[in-house]
């Protein structure tokens, strides 16, 4: 075991537990638990969004993909960044103005039917759980590699910590864990990027020229098609990334942590700059790993290339820099899973328990109790499923999370705000069509079926797309449209839609429910 890494891991755990202790003292109401009382500034929330969004897949996965596949690895990261243009121009302001705690609140501002809120809440729980299991499986494998801990023990450590942060600290603790993670990640990535760039004499021309001979791909390293050989697959994947982000519940609830829509927009702009700079720096990480660690050493440590960044740190700065990068990866995992637990728990406690079961009549104390127990339940379920999934290829869960978010959530968000004729039937059918089509298509994809036995089942996939976004997203919108136009309810509530338009874009009356 690398003792330096172990001590840095302990330091991060200690720091985050101290944050949780002070956050717990401030978390007395449901507003503070769900949204930190709306007290974050735009820059703070931007850092938290970046901390929530830049997962271990972003830090370790993309650096590894660039190191192994060059251009295709960087192109994969573009989808994550461009997604925030959709969030900025379509989602952030209406969501903040119409909702209160969850995504379902926004839909319920127009449609009062309990079944609509229930379906939206179940989508949130499903997306968060899929994503969380994938993160926990990755966490277990990563910590096992870095510290030599048993996989189950590693998952339990992360699981227990995320439960403590959410149950006791709520959104306040979650936000500050994410902010600290974002600062550490940016600092660590910047240091390594500068060192790598110095090795190339601070010359981009030199760097690109050397990369043509640094890998087995030769000059093709800088060209597309090394990993994604089917253009349709690339298009489908990036479509799901770009549109799926606008429907990810753990990202959406962050817009409730600020006081108004203007600050929500500032949050998105801040997050976009942070995320954009980060992904530019992953090029230096990937190129550096390819040049100074080498293809064989990277794949020997991890076939997918996830150890590229830590190995680069070790090559450049010895055990200390390796330990620092490993600790950042640990903080990255903690920040993301904490946000996922909170989004799933909020959907159950606020939408299902408080609004549907108790019909909005639950007391503040009852809501807080439900939220905390929901956090425990979500955490325990995810931990158990992650332990069970140790030997499985869980890449399909990430594809599924983004596909469901884009196919089931985004049609509801867009049509609720922008389509006058949209009705409850359309909302229900759009959500269900998107959810079911994403589930079915992913279950038939190469992420689940592989003739060589590299996926869950051995056999030929029924569809060639690992991420079915290019099919399931249009189906979600089509289901919402057909559900509306074929509905027996042909009435258009002009007054309600007019009020939604005013509230969505100005925030007028947004606190009056």
UniProtKB/Swiss-Prot annotation:
It is found in: Cell membrane. The chain crosses the membrane at residues 3-23, 47-67, 71-91, 129-149, 153-173, 177-197, 233-253, 273-293, 320-340, 374-394, 395-415, 424-444, 462-482. One of its GO terms (molecular function) is acetate transmembrane transporter activity. Keywords: Cell membrane, Ion transport, Membrane, Sodium, Sodium transport, Symport, Transmembrane, Transmembrane helix, Transport. InterPro entries: Na/Glc_symporter_sf (IPR038377), Na/solute_symporter (IPR001734), Na/solute_symporter_CS (IPR018212), Sodium:Solute_Symporter (IPR050277). Gene3D superfamilies: Sodium/glucose cotransporter. One of its GO terms (cellular component) is plasma membrane. It comes from the Bacteria. It is a multi-pass membrane protein. It holds the Pfam family SSF. Its main location: membrane. GO terms for biological process: plasma membrane acetate transport; sodium ion transport. PROSITE patterns: NA_SOLUT_SYMP_1 (PS00456), NA_SOLUT_SYMP_2 (PS00457), NA_SOLUT_SYMP_3 (PS50283). Belongs to the sodium:solute symporter (SSF) (TC 2.A.21) family. NCBIfam families: sss. This is Uncharacterized symporter YwcA. It comes from Bacillus subtilis (strain 168).
